[in-house]
Amino acid sequence: QAIISVIGSDMSRFPTDRHISSWAGLCPGDNESAKKRKSGKTRKGNALLRTTLITCAHAAVKNKKSYFYAQYMRISAHRGPKRAYVAVAHSMLISIYHILKDGVIFKDLGADYYNQFNKERKINAYLKKLKALGWEVPVVAA
């Protein structure tokens, strides 16, 4: 209710999901110079919407069988928990935008989404690590 009271139910004022995330102050910063990438601060946006979404992200991460938990674990390992919560809040806002604009039903991708994504790539990476450790492993499909 708090989210809809802030953004409204009419999404025609936001042409794309990037516009609403920028308005909310949840768009990721991207500063690149000479092939060096530095993350920037998120811009000032609607404080009520931002804090509400980050609070919702805290709650969504508690369910260990959800896509948001998998996203949080993947990002927090490298970037830290606070940035991971902001990233989850950003994903939630994009989902809310498409639910309100297009009328689609939310479908949770599940916690194993990232494991199924690029399965071949992960297999090759693990085989390469084992080979570097001196192990030769035959590959047999299960």
Label every model-predicted segment.
Residues 34-39, 71-75, 79-90, 95-142:
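Low-complexity, acidic/Ser/Thr- and charged residue-rich accessory regions of DNA metabolism proteins
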Residues 1-86, 116-117:
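Phosphate-backbone recognition surface of nucleic-acid-processing proteins
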